Each structure stands twice: as C-alpha cells, then as structure tokens.
Swiss-Prot record:
Note: There are multiple copies of the stellate gene in fruit fly, encoding proteins that are extremely similar, which makes their individual characterization difficult. Thus, most experiments probably do not discriminate between the different members.
Induction description: In wild-type flies, it is strongly down-regulated by double-stranded RNA (dsRNA) interference mediated by Su(Ste) transcripts. In males lacking the Y chromosome, the absence of Su(Ste) locus, relieves such down-regulation, explaining why it is strongly expressed.
Distribution of this protein across tissues and organs: Probably not expressed in wild-type flies. In males lacking the Y chromosome, it is testis-specific and constitutes the main component of star-shaped crystals.
Family matches, as Gene3D superfamilies: 2.20.25.20, protein kinase ck2 holoenzyme, chain C, domain 1
Disulfide bond entries: none
Function: Unknown. In males lacking the Y chromosome, its strong overexpression leads to the appearance of proteinaceous star-shaped crystals in the primary spermatocytes causing meiotic drive, possibly by interfering with normal casein kinase 2 activity.
Subunit structure: Interacts in vitro with the casein kinase 2 alpha subunit (CkII-alpha). The relevance of such interaction is however unclear in vivo.
UniProt organism field: Drosophila melanogaster
Pfam families membership: CK_II_beta (PF01214)
Protein name per Swiss-Prot or TrEMBL: Stellate protein CG33247
Matching SUPFAM superfamilies: Casein kinase II beta subunit
Family: Belongs to the casein kinase 2 subunit beta family.
InterPro entries per UniProt: Casein_kin_II_reg-sub_N, Casein_kinase_II_beta-like, Casein_kinase_II_reg-sub
Length: 172
C-alpha cells in the first residue's frame, strides 16, 4: 500500500486487502455505524473510531487487537441482512469461495461456514450445498468461522432457494 493510499484508506480497506480475507464482503459504513447492529459488542465506540478512520501506518495492523473480531462479528450479522446476502450471492455466483472437492458434485460452488458462532473455536470452512459436506478451503485463509457462523448456508439457501442443486430436490 502506498503512502497516498494509507491516508485515504480505512482500517476496513486495509483488512479486506490482506491475503486470505477474500471470503469477506465489505460491510457498508452506515451498517457499521448503526447502533442496533453493534448491540452486544464490546468497545464499539473505540473500535468504530479505529476501523473507520484512515490508516496512518498499515504495518501497525490491529491497534487494540479486537478490531478483527469486532469487524468479523458485524460481518456475520451483515451477511444475514438483505444487502449482505446480495453481496454474498455475487461472490457465490462468481465462485469466489471455491468449489466442492467431491468429484460427484461436479465443481459445485461453495459457501463459507463456521462450525461455531463463538469466536476462536475454529477457522472458516466451505460448505457444499449439493453433498451437504464441509471442507477446508483451498485458499490460504485463517478467518475465524464465527465471521460467518454455522447457520449461514442454511439461511442463504432458504432465502435464495433457486440456487439449490436439482440433486437436492427429492422429487427429481
């Protein structure tokens, strides 16, 4: 990142640009700033200031240490909202999350999933809607699974049922 970018880029820009964070979508500033979406999150006023202000020194990374967790938990909420589902739908359709390694699934696009909604329990996995299995992603990511949660694929496909594979339909 050049110094001119540092002065115009927020912590969110810096964080999303880190290799391995490509599963995340950008949570809009208005969503992040909405106090309803911050309910239950600790230190929100201090962390909000950090993640929305321009990054002075990208090498400083996490100033308090909780920014990644805080953004991840806001992200988990956002991807369940309409705008977040639309953003994740675009990424899903492009195949940004990878494809199922199971040969019988014929390179089915996958979705990110967390095995727990609790921070620090596991890293993100990919979920195949065809075989209903979870796998380690091929991409080099160490994102916490709580950034997506265990129910995200179920919510995604229940709200976008036309994306489920015909093989999932018991009538076929």
């Amino acid at each position: 990142m050049s110094s001119s970018q540092n002065n115009n880029s927020s912590w969110i820009d810096w964080f999303l640009g880190i290799k391995g964070n490509q599963f995340l979508c950008r949570v809009p500033t208005d969503y992040v700033q909405d106090t309803f979406n911050q309910m239950g999150l600790e230190y929100f006023s201090e962390i909000l200031d950090v993640i929305l202000k321009p990054v002075i020194d990208s090498s400083s990374g996490l100033l308090y240490g909780d920014e990644k967790k805080w953004y991840g938990m806001i992200h988990a909420r956002y991807i369940r909202a309409e705008r977040g589902l639309i953003a994740m739908h675009r990424k899903y359709m492009r195949g940004d999350f990878g494809s199922c390694p199971n040969i019988s699934c014929d390179r089915q696009n996958t979705l990110p999933v967390g095995l727990s909604a609790v921070w620090g329990k596991s890293t993100v996995k990919i979920h195949c809607p065809r075989c209903k299995s979870n796998f380690h992603p091929k991409s080099d990511t160490q994102l916490d699974g709580a950034m997506f949660g265990p129910s995200f694929p179920d919510i995604f496909f229940s709200l976008l049922p036309n994306l489920t594979s015909p093989l999932d339909d018991p009538r076929t």
